[in-house]
């Protein structure tokens, strides 16, 4: 846990909500609480704290809205549905959130994010960041690509595609593919195959691989064509991808640390296991 530098100026707060009725109600209550408080200034421009109201998808959108300001921004999530992995507060805990923010001392919890670098055949380079995951697929035909880990050719992959996830993203698409669940404070990436071909002719490892912070992953397609690349909830299509590189970004996402911070394992239990039967 680290602490962000604080000054005597008012804390700038951005409130981002989805269009659901309950989310709008929460947003209105937060606006009313901070609007006339001299210690806070409501603004979506250059905020110190971003309050995301909705679900994990809303927080993903908020992350990408402010991904160029990660050094200066801390996030906090309010869930208006079932408990999310990025949310510490439910919609009925708004008063607790308001009180915690009024007593905030700048403490934060940081999680690693994914750096994505796409190189095209024409020399163009596209750079992006992902909070959860990125995939590369070739929809119309089997994807054939070399998987290179830390400059070592690990395997030649044949199948539908490849997913690379962050620890926080390990509970999303990665888990549905049989990948491991990683605690978000672990600085590592996870590479997971999507429907790989495994028979007497073609072989892949067939299981997820955990990649440490110091190593990088390269996916090098071996066939020309159109590739579909997802970066969190955004999907793009590129023709003739030379390679796509994945590594842990120099930046991280910072969350407001409060007494109400829900432990990661509580979130996993709530999402996938629930209360045990007696």
Curated annotation (Swiss-Prot):
It catalyses: NAD(+) + ATP = ADP + NADP(+) + H(+). Its main location: cytoplasm. SUPFAM superfamilies: NAD kinase/diacylglycerol kinase-like. The keyword Cytoplasm applies. It is an enzyme of class 2 (transferase). The active site is at 56 (proton acceptor). It is found in: Cytoplasm. GO terms for biological process: NAD metabolic process; NADP biosynthetic process. The lineage of its organism: Bacteria, Bacillati, Bacillota, Bacilli, Lactobacillales. This is NAD kinase. One of its GO terms (cellular component) is cytoplasm. Signal peptide: none annotated. Its EC number is 2.7.1.23. NAD(+) binds at residues 56-57, 132-133, 158, 160, 171-176. Belongs to the NAD kinase family. The keyword Protease does not apply. Involved in the regulation of the intracellular balance of NAD and NADP, and is a key enzyme in the biosynthesis of NADP. Catalyzes specifically the phosphorylation on 2'-hydroxyl of the adenosine moiety of NAD to yield NADP. Its cofactor is a divalent metal cation. GO terms for molecular function: ATP binding; metal ion binding; NAD binding; NAD+ kinase activity.
């Amino acid at each position: 846990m680290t602490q962000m530098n604080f000054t005597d100026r008012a804390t700038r707060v951005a409130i981002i909500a989805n269009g659901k009725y309950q989310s709008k109600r929460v947003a209105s209550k937060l606006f009313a609480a901070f609007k006339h408080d001299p210690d806070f200034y409501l603004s979506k421009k250059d905020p110190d704290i971003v309050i995301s109201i909705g679900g994990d998808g809303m927080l993903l959108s908020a992350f990408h809205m402010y991904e160029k300001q990660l050094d200066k921004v801390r996030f906090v999530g309010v869930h208006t549905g079932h408990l999310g992995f990025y949310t510490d507060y439910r919609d009925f805990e708004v008063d607790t959130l308001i009180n915690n923010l009024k007593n905030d001392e700048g403490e934060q919890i940081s999680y690693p994010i994914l750096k994505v670098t796409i190189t095209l055949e024409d020399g163009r380079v596209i750079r992006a960041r992902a909070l959860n995951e990125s995939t590369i697929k070739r929809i119309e035909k089997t994807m054939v690509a070399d998987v290179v880990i830390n400059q070592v050719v690990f395997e030649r992959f044949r199948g539908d595609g490849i997913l690379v996830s962050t620890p926080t993203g390990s509970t999303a698409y990665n888990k549905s593919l049989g990948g491991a669940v990683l605690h978000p404070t672990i600085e590592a990436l996870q590479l997971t195959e999507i429907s790989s071909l495994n028979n007497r002719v073609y072989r892949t490892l067939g299981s997820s691989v955990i990649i440490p912070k110091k190593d990088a992953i390269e996916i090098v397609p071996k066939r020309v064509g159109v590739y579909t690349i997802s970066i969190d909830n955004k999907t793009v299509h590129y023709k003739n991808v030379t390679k796509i590189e994945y590594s842990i970004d120099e930046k991280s996402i910072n969350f407001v640390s409060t007494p109400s911070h829900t432990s990661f394992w509580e979130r996993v239990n709530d999402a996938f296991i629930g209360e045990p039967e007696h």
